[in-house]
Amino acid sequence: MSASTVSITASPRTIRRTPVLSGEKKSNFDFPPSESHANAAIGESSAGTNKDLIRAEAAGERSNTYDVGPVTRKSGSTATGTNTTTTQRRTRKSQGNKIDRGKWKTVVRVFAKQFGALLLLVGLIQLIRKLTLKDSSLSSSNFPIETEMVLSELESRISAVDGLVKTTTKMMQVQVEFLDKKMDSESRALRQTIDSTSSVLHSELKKVESKTERLQVSVDELNAKPLVSREELERVYEELKKGKVGDSDVNIDKLRAYARDIVEKEIGKHVADGLGRVDYALASGGAFVMGHSDPFLVGNGRNWFGTSRRRVHSKAVKMLTPSFGEPGQCFPLKGSNGYVLVRLRAPIIPEAVTLEHVSKAVAYDRSSAPKDCRVSGWLGDIDMETETMPLLTEFSYDLDRSNAQTFDIADSAHSGLVNTVRLDFNSNHGSSSHTCIYRFRVHGRELDSVSVAHA
């Protein structure tokens, strides 16, 4: 048994001893060097007093429980036989434990602060979330009403557009049906017109074919028969005998040859432009129209001044070309009086002029034929307004004669050379609106170079 144990058990229980501590007072909690410097301003006396009071209370409680005296530690020497009481000092191990405990307290304190800040932040987030959800709930409560209004307005607009589309479609269908009916009726009318026109043309072609057949038959008959029959020759012979012509002077074969020559000459005349005379006013030979009075034209033909530099209409050339007796192949001039100015293909001595109109056998109306006419001619250029135009001939066109009527120039030898001829007409056969010129011809003879030089 140790000496400390003996001292505790030997003390009577009734005696309460005051614990006396000896030795150096030290703090129960060793601060780190940084903290000890920071707390130096507070004071060491108050800290040490508080810690001594805590330590005294703890010792009193232990003494009341166990009735023991102060714990002392006796040390002796076997050599001297003496005991030494000393206060137990804290080892460096216990001081190391206190430093670790202080670090843990700092960590816990920092953690507690961070945790509190985290809790505060979480609370703020929850509060903001509740407010946001509340606002969204309020706005969502109004959303269905606005949505219904928008949807109803959209439905009304869609229905209006649908009605407009239906109405437009119906109108387009009506227009299409109307156009279809109109096109159908017009196509039927056009088809009927074409059919009627084709039937008329077909009938006219049949008439032409029949006429052609009759003409062919007539030509064949003429070719089969002699030009002069024997009966006609005998009749001519009897007449010649009555005219006191001797038999020695008359021969039937000679008469037949004479008649043949006459017929061939007449046929040659008709083949040679119908007259058998040279036309120096023929357009294909080099002649042309230099001017004319106002033409009688309708429709697009009214604008005729821009067609030529000489203010001559493009259709005026018809007056200098063969018409072949076809109605309408003429150049109409306005009114019952007018003129035509023609430049001949070459200078000539004029002998006659020919004025042609449509034949009575094929004409629809001959009231537009010219009546009283006057022809002038000269060589070169003259001023028709100031100078007198030399007169060649005057005549009247007669409807009872042939369609191509020739009028001779009485004094052609004294007229001299001419290369320009003017036809003036002062009246026609009844038409007040226009006068038609089918063809105008000028006949004469050219002089050779020697004659022209002497002239």
From Swiss-Prot:
**Which superkingdom heads the taxonomic lineage of this protein's source?**
Eukaryota
- What is the reported phenotype of gene knockout? No visible phenotype. When associated with SUN1 disruption, abnormal nuclear shape in some cells such as mature root hairs but also numerous meiotic defects namely a delay in the progression of meiosis, absence of full synapsis and a reduction in the mean cell chiasma frequency.
Q: GO biological process annotations for this chain's record? A: meiotic attachment of telomere to nuclear envelope; nucleus organization; protein heterooligomerization; protein homooligomerization; protein localization to nuclear envelope
Q: In which tissues is it expressed?
A: Expressed in roots, hypocotyls, cotyledons and leaves and inflorescences.
Report the source organism.
Arabidopsis thaliana
* Residues the record lists as N-acetylserine modifications: S2
Q: Which ranges does the record list as Nuclear topological domains? A: 2-105
Domain comment quoted from the record? The SUN domain may play a role in nuclear anchoring and/or migration. The SUN domain is required for interactions with WIP proteins.
Cellular component GO terms, alphabetically? endoplasmic reticulum; endoplasmic reticulum membrane; nuclear envelope; nuclear inner membrane; phragmoplast; spindle
Q: Where is this motif: Nuclear localization signal?
A: 88-95
SUBUNIT field: Forms homomers (e.g. dimers, trimers and tetramers) and heteromers with SUN1. Interacts with SUN3, SUN4 and TIK. Core component of the LINC complex which is composed of inner nuclear membrane SUN domain-containing proteins coupled to outer nuclear membrane WIP and WIT proteins. The LINC complex also involves nucleoskeletal proteins CRWN/LINC and possibly KAKU4 and the cytoskeletal myosin KAKU1. Interacts with LINC1, WIP1, WIP2 and WIP3 at the nuclear envelope (NE). Interacts with SINE1, SINE2, SINE3 and SINE4. Interacts with NEAP1, NEA2 and NEAP3.
Compositional bias (Polar residues) spans? Answer: 1-12
Q: What effect on the protein does mutating Y438F have, as reported in its record?
A: Strongly affects binding to SINE1, SINE2, SINE3 and SINE4
Q: What is this protein called?
A: SUN domain-containing protein 2
Query: What are the alphabetically sorted keywords of the record?
Result: Acetylation, Coiled coil, Cytoplasm, Cytoskeleton, Endoplasmic reticulum, Membrane, Nucleus, Phosphoprotein, Signal-anchor, Transmembrane, Transmembrane helix
Mind listing the GO molecular function terms for this protein? protein-membrane adaptor activity
Topology relative to the lipid bilayer, per the entry, is:
Single-pass type II membrane protein
Could you tell me which InterPro entries the record lists for this protein?
Answer: SUN1-5, SUN_dom
